[in-house]
Structures are given as structure tokens and as C-alpha cells.
Amino acid sequence: MDSKVTIGLIQAHHDTNGDRPVEEHKAAAIAKHISMIREAKKRGAQIVCLQEIFYGPYFCTEQTAKWYDAVEEIPSGPTTRIMQDLAKELGIVLVVPMYEQEFAGIYYNTAAVIDADGRYLGKYRKHHIPQVQAGPAGCGFWEKYYFRPGNLGYPVFDTAFAKVGVYICYDRHFPEGARALGLHGAEIVLNPSATVAGLSEHLWKLEQPAHAVANGYYVGAINRVGREAPWNMGEFYGQSYLVNPRGEFVAMGSRDHDEIVIGVMDRDVIREVRNTWQFFRDRRPDSYGDLVAQ
């Protein structure tokens, strides 16, 4: 397996007004992202990650049953199958965040992981579900209305190019799962997000570099861009990035443009950092009982 792997992180505006029907949102966003995935492949990407619930707006700023119609089963739903065919055609790994239905009324914020031969490898369900006011009165991250907390643990997927973990948006504020992904062997953790200026921006470039350093892996952080009507809860500030285990930014996107952020993950850097900072060796799990006792 090559030491170096090219990572593609896709950040994009959602171009359809929230008042439009759900299927119109999905069709337009899927077509847009297929085009961007193809461009990422042309630019050398081997692993490509899309933004949180890529085929819709960030609808969690309101609490409206309309958006339950955006759910799909994973992997049997149509979007997973489209992305399996695309991954196989292009020979790339895809991480595809979607709104998942387990069965009627049981819904998750989920990312499917698809290998370079088109095989579905599994999924990660977002663990930490926010309920936080943000932006104008009435707007917020009202995710408990839409999602149950994830129940599949912190899997690491052994893909054709790297061992990949996933941590979705609000998860990034919690170091425990980030550590679990490291202990499970992740070489890179991908964090598809939807977050706005004013609430979390000053944390955006702090928390995930810290996870990368503490766990000796790369982190790919993805955020959408622009403002989404009719809610206008705030500016999705983009700046998707790849950060290495030294805490150095390898690549970073713009604040306000559709963009494919390309960066290189290097296993030699992972090995060098882990051999220098022996954080896994020096852990004291025998003393951490308080973390799960309350």
C-alpha cells in the first residue's frame, strides 16, 4: 500500500430554496455533487468525502415534518446505489453523508462508506445530537427533532487506500469518540459538517487539529458554504481542511466558494508522529473511570 493517499473534500452551496419540494432538493444536489466527485477524481483524489446530509439544505434550522421525506434506507436506498456505481466507475472511496431511515419513525444522521470497487463497507451514525439556538429568533441546530443518537459505535473502515473513520459535525466537540477512532486504527477521520459563523467558527481550527495530534491521525473537516433561504440562520463559512498529526494544515478551502479541497495523507508522517509522541502507550485507562461513571 502506498505511503501517500490523495484526499478530496467537497464543500458546496446548496442551491435550492428550502420552500421547494424535498425531491427537487435531492435531485439537484445529487447531480451537482456527482459532477464535483468526477472533478475530484480528475484532480487525483482517491478518497472523497461530501458534506453533512449532502443532498439537502441544513433543514434542522426548523422543525418541520416535511424533511422526514428526505430519509433513505442505507444501503438499499437509491442514493447509496448511485454512489456505489460511481465509486466503482471511478475507482475511488466515497464517504456519503445522508439522512437514514432504519424504519418508519426511526431516523439517523449517517454516513455510508463505499470502497473503490463499489462495495458498501458500512456506515457511521452521528452520536452526539445538538439542540442549540443559533442565528435569528427561532433558528437553531434543532437536530433532536430529526435524529436519534447513533448506536453503531465508532467503526473504522479498511478501504482500498486507508483506514477511515467518520465523525459527523457536532461529534467533533467530544474528544472521547475521536480517541476511540484512533484506538480502532484510523489513519484518517473525516468530519462532514454544517456549521455557521458566530457560534463555532473560533473552534473550527482548534478542536480537530487537537484530535489529529492527540491520536496521531489525519482529519478531513468539511463545511458547506453560503446562506440558505428562507431561513438565513447564518453564514456557512466553508474553510474545509486536511490537517496532519502534527497539527499542521495540509490544505484548506475558501470561505465562500464551491470547492474541492485536495490534500495528501502520508503514512510516514503518521508513523513518525506516533513514534515520537507515544500517546497510545502512555494512556492510563485504569484511571479514566470517572469519564463514564457520570
Predicted regions and their residues:
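Active-site-proximal beta-strand elements of phosphoester/diester hydrolases
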Residues: 4-18, 22, 110, 123, ...
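A conserved C-terminal secondary-structure "cap"
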Residues: 268-294
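A short, N-terminal amphipathic alpha-helix
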Residues: 31-47, 81-89
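Active-site catalytic loop in hydrolytic enzyme cores
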Residues: 72, 85, 102-187, 197-210, ...
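CN hydrolase (nitrilase-like) catalytic-core segments centered on the catalytic cysteine
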Residues: 75-95, 163, 168-260
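Acidic/histidine-rich helix-loop elements
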Residues: 14-27, 135-137, 142
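Metal-dependent catalytic neighborhoods of phosphoester/phosphodiester hydrolases
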Residues: 53-72, 103-107
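Short, glycine-anchored, charge-dense loop/turn motifs used at functional sites
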Residues: 7, 113-121, 243-251
